Regions:
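Active-site nucleophile elbow and catalytic-triad environment of alpha/beta-hydrolase enzymes
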Residues: 71-93
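Conserved loop-alpha-helix segment in the C-terminal half of the alpha/beta-hydrolase fold
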Residues: 106-145
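Conserved beta-strand scaffold positions in the cores of enzyme catalytic domains, especially
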Residues: 6, 102, 143-145
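Alpha/beta-hydrolase-fold enzymes
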Residues: 1-75
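Short beta-strand/loop motif that positions the catalytic acidic residue
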Residues: 96, 102-104, 110
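Catalytic active-site module of serine/aspartate enzymes centered on a nucleophile-bearing elbow/loop
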Residues: 138-177
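Short, conserved loop/helix-junction motifs that constitute active-site signature segments
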Residues: 93-97, 136-138
Length: 177
C-alpha cells in the first residue's frame, strides 16, 4: 500500500550544538567519519533524558535499561556523517508528496542538574531548528507545537500525551476524510 500521510515527532533536522560546533565541529567530525567510520565519539546528548523517563528514577515508564541506557553510548562517526549528510538535504528544502504533520515541544532546555525541565521540554533537540527546517519543506506540511512536551512527545506526562494524540487524530481525520 502507498504511504498516504506522515507524522514526524522526533525531527532530527539539525544537531543541537553551539554555532561554533555546528559550523566547524560537526562538518569536521563528519569528514573524519568518511575515513574512520567505526571510530566512536561521545553522543553529547543531555544526560537527564533516560532518568526523566524511567520509573526507577524520575519518570513513569518501565523499560529495559539495557536497551535504553541511563548514560548514552558513544556513536560511530559513520552515524554522525550519515545524519549530517541527510540534514544538509533537509536544510536545502525537500518536497514531501504526502500530507505531513510535524509536531514538537514548545521549548528546548539543557538542564545541567536534574530538574523538571527534563520532563516538560525537549532536552535533546532544539525546537527552533525543527520549526526552521520544517518551514523550508514544501508540500502539504502542518506544524504543531505541544506545550510542555518532552523530546519524545508520546512519552510526555499524561495530559501532554492526551494533547499529542488529540492533535494527531484530529489531523488524521481531517486529512483522511
Amino acid at each position: 500500500t502507498a504511504l498516504t500521510a506522515t507524522f514526524i515527532f522526533l525531527a532530527f533536522y539539525d544537531f543541537n550544538k553551539t554555532a561554533f560546533e555546528q559550523k566547524f565541529g560537526i562538518p569536521c567530525i563528519s569528514q573524519f567519519g568518511k575515513y574512520t567510520p567505526d571510530l566512536e565519539f561521545p553522543s553529547g546528548l543531555n544526560r537527564w533524558y533516560t532518568p526523566s523517563l524511567h520509573l526507577s528514577m524520575y519518570g513513569e515508564w518501565n523499560f529495559n535499561l539495557e536497551w535504553k541506557k541511563e548514560k548514552f553510548p558513544k556513536v560511530r562517526l559513520s552515524f554522525i556523517r550519515a545524519i549530517y549528510e541527510a540534514q544538509k538535504e533537509i536544510h536545502k528544502g525537500v518536497y514531501l508528496s504526502v500530507p505531513t504533520l510535524v509536531m514538537y515541544s514548545n521549548r528546548t532546555t539543557n538542564p545541567k542538574q536534574w530538574n523538571s525541565d527534563a520532563q516538560h521540554s525537549d532536552i535533546i533537540l532544539n525546537v527552533k531548528d525543527i520549526e526552521k527546517y520544517a518551514l523550508k519543506m514544501s508540500g502539504n506540511i502542518q506544524l504543531c507545537t505541544i506545550k510542555n512536551g518532552m523530546h519524545d512527545l508520546v512519552l510526555s506526562s499524561a495530559p501532554v500525551r492526551e494533547k499529542v494524540y488529540s492533535e494527531l487524530f484530529q489531523w488524521l481525520n481531517f486529512k483522511m476524510s
